[in-house]
Amino acid sequence: ICPRILMPCSSDSDCLAECICLENGFCG
């Protein structure tokens, strides 16, 4: 489950839990 928090990212490793880095530059 990915927490619904807007987090800027450049790669999946910047994101929490099962989130991935989306094309818009945020985790999701």
Curated annotation (Swiss-Prot):
Listed GO MF terms: serine-type endopeptidase inhibitor activity
Record has Secreted as a keyword: yes
GO cellular component: extracellular region
S-S pairs: C2-C19, C9-C21, C15-C27
Site (Reactive bond): R4, I5
Cross-referenced InterPro entries: Prot_inh_squash, Proteinase_amylase_inhib_sf
SUPFAM superfamilies per UniProt: Plant inhibitors of proteinases and amylases (SSF57027)
Alphabetized UniProt keyword annotations: Disulfide bond, Knottin, Protease inhibitor, Secreted, Serine protease inhibitor
This protein's name: Trypsin inhibitor 4
Lineage of source species: Eukaryota, Viridiplantae, Streptophyta, Embryophyta, Tracheophyta
